[in-house]
Amino acid sequence: MEINTHNAEILLSAANKSHYPQDDIPEIALAGRSNVGKSSFINTLLNRKNLARTSGKPGKTQLLNFFNIDDKLRFVDVPGYGYARVSKKEREKWGRMIEEYLTSRENLRAVVSLVDLRHDPSADDVQMYEFLKYYDIPVILVATKADKIPRGKWNKHESAIKKKLDFDKNDDFILFSSVTKDGLDAAWDAILSKI
C-alpha cells in the first residue's frame, strides 16, 4: 500500500467510543510511558515537526488522539501511562478509556508499544505488554531514544528489555531514534505489514 505521509492531520480527540470515527480505516495505536517519545515517534514517521505535540510535561495527552494519514491509515495516540502527578481517579479513568479502545475497536490492527531503550521496562510497560498478549492484539515493540546509547551497547539493552517483558519472538522489535532516524524504515515496514 502506498501512503502519502505528507497528507497527515490530527482528525479528532475522543474520550470514549461514541466519539471514535465511524468507518473502516485501519488503525495503529501507540502506547507507552509518559515521555517515552510517542509524539516524536509520530512526528518522525510522518516527517513533520509538530503534528503531534511534544511536551516537556509528561501526562499531556489525556484523550485518544486520532491522526488521519492519507485517508488510508490512522495512528491513535493513547494517553501516556505511569505518570505519578495525576490523581489515582484520573489514572483509573484513563485506564478504562484505553482498555475500552484496545478491546473493542474493530479498526485496530496492532499496537506500537514504546519503551525507552536506556531503561529496563517499568511495571506499567510489562503490564501493557501482558495485556496486549492476553487479548491477542498484534504488538510492534519500539525501543526509543537509541541515539542516547552507544551502538555497541544496543544488543545488551535489547536483551534486557526482552527478558523483562518475556518477549514473544514472533513480535516485531525495533530500535528507534527520532534524532538519527534509525528504525524509521523498519517501523513503517512493520506497520504496513499489519494493515
Swiss-Prot record:
Function per UniProt: Necessary for normal cell division and for the maintenance of normal septation.
PANTHER family: ENGB-TYPE G DOMAIN-CONTAINING PROTEIN (PTHR11649:SF13), MSS1/TRME-RELATED GTP-BINDING PROTEIN (PTHR11649)
UniProt: GTP binding residues: 32-39, 59-63, 77-80, 144-147, 176-178
Any single Pfam family the record assigns to this protein: MMR_HSR1
Protein name: Probable GTP-binding protein EngB
Gene: engB
Keyword Cell division assigned: yes
Residues engaged in binding Mg(2+): S39, T61
Domain EngB-type G: 24-195
Family: Belongs to the TRAFAC class TrmE-Era-EngA-EngB-Septin-like GTPase superfamily. EngB GTPase family.
GO biological process: division septum assembly
One GO MF term attached to the UniProt entry: metal ion binding
GO CC, any one term: cytosol
Domain of life: Bacteria
Keywords: Cell cycle, Cell division, GTP-binding, Magnesium, Metal-binding, Nucleotide-binding, Septation
Cofactors, names only: Mg(2+)
